[in-house]
């Protein structure tokens, strides 16, 4: 197997569902190694969470700027290569932009940004810097979805004529507001 991609995470600490999903998904195929990140706006909480994950405390940062500054001082073979952005929606753009401008590949939770113009700007930076920028669609990583995909590909369930999907959530009506996001902010 080739060397694992060194991963950092912004947000997604504690009992954050999206944080759990990203950590599990990144470990499913043994392609990523979580190196560090910023898991909570309160550094002490972030440090404690990093300790629970078995991370070196020197790689659990107080904020994005300190992470970028510290990681960029490291030898290229040791620094974080890609960062998952799991923060409240309104922070996706400024954080992803800063990461791209500092030569980190980005894996961003939905929504990519809160405006079309921001999305175009990120796309242009990504192209100029020749970096990878991915927006997650986490259902593709679920074991049941993978099994269903294999069953369809192998003809186990016959020809598919129609697919109906239902996504249930206990999220409040205001959970889709772009100025919110993150249930503890």
What is the predicted function of each stretch?
Residues 1-55:
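N-terminal Rossmann-like dinucleotide-binding module
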Residues 3-5, 131, 161:
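Nucleotide donor/acceptor-binding cores
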Residues 35, 58, 81:
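Conserved acidic residues
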Residues 61-80:
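A structured beta-alpha segment of the ubiquitous adenosine-cofactor-binding alpha/beta core
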Residues 82, 88-140, 155:
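Beta-strand-loop-alpha-helix segment that lines the small-molecule cofactor/substrate pocket
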Residues 141-164:
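Oxidoreductase and adenylate-handling cofactor-binding alpha/beta cores
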Residues 167-172:
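Conserved small/polar residues in nucleotide/adenosyl-binding loops
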Residues 179-185:
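Hydrophobic alpha-helical segments, chiefly the membrane-spanning helices
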């Amino acid at each position: 197997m080739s060397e694992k991609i060194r991963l950092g995470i912004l947000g997604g600490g504690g009992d954050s569902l999206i944080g759990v999903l990203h950590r599990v998904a990144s470990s499913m195929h043994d392609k990523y190694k979580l190196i560090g990140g910023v898991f909570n706006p309160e550094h002490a909480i972030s440090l404690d969470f990093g300790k629970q994950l078995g991370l070196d405390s020197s790689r659990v940062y107080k904020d994005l700027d300190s992470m970028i500054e510290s990681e960029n001082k490291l030898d290229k073979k040791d620094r974080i290569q890609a960062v998952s952005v799991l923060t409240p929606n309104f922070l996706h753009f400024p954080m992803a932009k800063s990461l791209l401008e500092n030569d980190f590949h980005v894996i961003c939770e939905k929504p990519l940004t809160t405006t079309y113009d921001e999305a175009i700007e990120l796309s242009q930076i990504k192209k100029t810097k020749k970096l990878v920028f991915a927006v997650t669609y986490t259902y593709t990583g679920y074991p049941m979805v993978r099994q269903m995909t294999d069953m369809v590909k192998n003809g186990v369930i016959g020809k598919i004529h129609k697919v109906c999907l239902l996504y249930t959530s206990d999220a409040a009506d205001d959970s889709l507001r772009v100025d919110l996001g993150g249930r503890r902010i």
